[in-house]
Amino acid sequence: MDVIPAIDLLAGRCVRLYQGDYDRSQVFSENPVDVAKQWVDEGATRLHIVDLDGAKAGKVVNLGAIEAIAQAISIPIEIGGGLRDRSSVEQVFNLGVQWAILGTVAVEQPQLVQELCQQYPGQIIIGIDARNGLVATRGWLETSEVLATQLAIQMQEMGAAAIIYTDIHRDGTLAGPNLDALRELAAAISIPVIASGGVSSVTDLLSLLALEPQGVTGVIVGRALYTGDISLKEALQAIGPGRIQDIPPNLDFSSFA
């Protein structure tokens, strides 16, 4: 399973929010490039970047920081936040980003998503951010009437490469992932699901590993890495491609669920 460190950008700095609340941000570094290099040095094979300013503004804002990170590291990057038109998506791909994460437009302009999936096959990921099972949009400031599972099915049909599922009530809380919601989502589609939000311990990571056969292929870890609750190295050893040992086939996963 992929363990993907998150870098959230706000005014050019690396921060973490609590439940998506911009007024409850905590600055972890003034230099996101140094943070990106640190995760690479610790074994990351992929990086998740969110332009928080962009998510609110509806356009990419932290271009300089994104470009600097892309130039400084060699592992692939996925970027989300403010990608709501074709030019913004083209803009980040021109910076050397591997995947573009679309959220709001998936709800508001599904036809555009389909066109972008055709133009960039395998490079469009849909970020589904849910509050009580309903999709939130525009930097989590609005909640739609669209069910997360319904949107995931529609986006799979449009050609999306993967779904990143974030439970907003868990994000930044270290309260553990929403396993039931992830299980339901993964069962509804055949493309990979990447879990995000709430991971606080190796136990949480192992509980997600139990969902890997159902299609949960990765996990994004944010606050827990920055607070030291989890080290990236131990996360990779626990559930990553280089994990210490394979899990016995007769292990009862029900205790994790």
From Swiss-Prot:
- Biological process GO terms, please? L-histidine biosynthetic process; L-tryptophan biosynthetic process
InterPro entries the record matches: Aldolase_TIM (IPR013785), His_biosynth (IPR006062), HisA_bact_arch (IPR006063), Isoase_HisA-like (IPR044524), Isoase_HisA-like_bact (IPR023016), RibuloseP-bd_barrel (IPR011060)
Q: What is its main location?
A: cytoplasm
SUPFAM superfamilies named in the record: Ribulose-phoshate binding barrel
Q: Which Enzyme Commission numbers does its entry carry?
A: 5.3.1.16
Q: What superkingdom does the record give?
A: Bacteria
Tell me the PANTHER family matching this sequence.
Answer: 1-(5-PHOSPHORIBOSYL)-5-[(5-PHOSPHORIBOSYLAMINO)METHYLIDENEAMINO] IMIDAZOLE-4-CARBOXAMIDE ISOMERASE
Write the protein's name: 1-(5-phosphoribosyl)-5-[(5-phosphoribosylamino)methylideneamino] imidazole-4-carboxamide isomerase
